[in-house]
Amino acid sequence: KQFNNLLKNKYFFNTVISNVTNIVELVNKKKSNAVILNYDESLDNFLKWYQQLLAESIGKKAKGIFPIISTMPKDNHSLMQLYLDGQKNNFYTFFSGADKISPKINKETILRSKNFLINKNLQDILDSKILATQKVFKKKKIPFRSFFLKTRKEETLGELFTFFVLETILIAKALKINPYDQPAVELIKKETNKILFNS
């Protein structure tokens, strides 16, 4: 029922189509690395699923989108220089979400030079980091999109699963790829069975 309702939702459907169009255009311009910037650790398992979905569905016939999960903000200090100033063959997806209220920083726990952080909490700092990163991406004309989860209800995750399955299928169709099989992986299975049978 929820799936049918989503398909009837013009905003949802138009958003899927818009994202598919943009991604196919980027892939055709040789931007085939999909860097997933994850600012919400509760999405770790979901994003591993998304990575698998994208890799196994699109990676065929010498084509593909290489999904790379980047753990943020940790990777701000190790990989962001590459993202901003390295090869221009990436496009980016920001994932973030509303967090539980964290304690505010008080003046007793901070250096005077950082007084501007007083009464801010960790979520405020993280949100500022995300916004700053996106502003720099825009200035440098680096392609990106952003998903923000207001809640983590089952319904929200169901919408995300539906969105990315539909998006992946339509990208595959646009690239003239069958998204439903894994012929190369089958070769490894066959070779493994041969080795085990003959050993």
What kind of feature is each model-predicted range?
Residues 18-29, 56, 81-84, 128, ...:
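Short, hydrophobic/amphipathic alpha-helical patches that form generic packing surfaces
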Residues 9-14, 94-104, 155-166:
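Short flexible/disordered coil segments
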Residues 53-57, 87-89, 111-115, 165-169:
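Short, low-complexity, polar/charged sequence segments that are solvent-exposed and flexible
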Residues 1-93, 101, 181, 185-199:
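Active-site phosphate/pyrophosphate-binding segments
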Residues 32-37, 64-65, 113-119, 148-150, ...:
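Glycine- and acidic
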Residues 68-153:
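Helicase-primase coupling helices
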Residues 1, 124, 128, 144-187:
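Short alpha-helices
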